[in-house]
């Protein structure tokens, strides 16, 4: 239990930040899931559209400190590879 005024304020700030970060993390997961569902359905156009929407969300989460920059980069890279593979198989 926080005793000093500054510790009490810090506790309040942490609680607010936690709520904001949870919302950001949830938003990122939603966008990534939409890309994965589009890939699973086999629709290359829908997958590309969903990927283009997810990419800035991942970058934003990394810049805000919700995700590590390397984690966001890795997720973008792997999603891009899967979307590209899907578009190659549908056109070939």
Curated annotation (Swiss-Prot):
Signal peptide: none
An annotated GO BP: translation
One example GO MF annotation: small ribosomal subunit rRNA binding
Keywords noted in UniProt: Ribonucleoprotein, Ribosomal protein, RNA-binding, rRNA-binding
GO cellular component, one term: cytosol
Protein purpose: Binds directly to 16S ribosomal RNA.
Protein's name according to its UniProt entry: Small ribosomal subunit protein bS20
